[in-house]
């Protein structure tokens, strides 16, 4: 899997190439996480990668991926409810899945955790202010 960025200085770089720059932290399989979008991309040590244009393009790509992956939920309704994601590892399959709870910690839904780990960071930022 690769996400391409149309950046003048880093044209059409895929996720592996970006990871080699220290911008991404390898998780498992093809899952990656950008450490901190609010302050741009950070490397594994928490040091900002000084390319805000690249950071914003990465954010947009991840947001688009997240939106398409979780379209089963209405994001605006979830935001109003103050929902939070809780991640669990299914012991029987070894796969991660997400459970969505509202502000009263009432179960809303779950999905198998096979999307970009970035979705959690994006949702956590948007759902929790």
UniProtKB/Swiss-Prot annotation:
This is Uncharacterized protein C212.03. Keywords: Cytoplasm, Nucleus. GO terms for cellular component: cytosol; nucleus. It comes from Schizosaccharomyces pombe (strain 972 / ATCC 24843). The lineage of its organism: Eukaryota, Fungi, Dikarya, Ascomycota, Taphrinomycotina. It comes from the Eukaryota. It is found in: Cytoplasm, Cytosol; Nucleus. Its main location: cytoplasm. The keyword Cytoplasm applies.
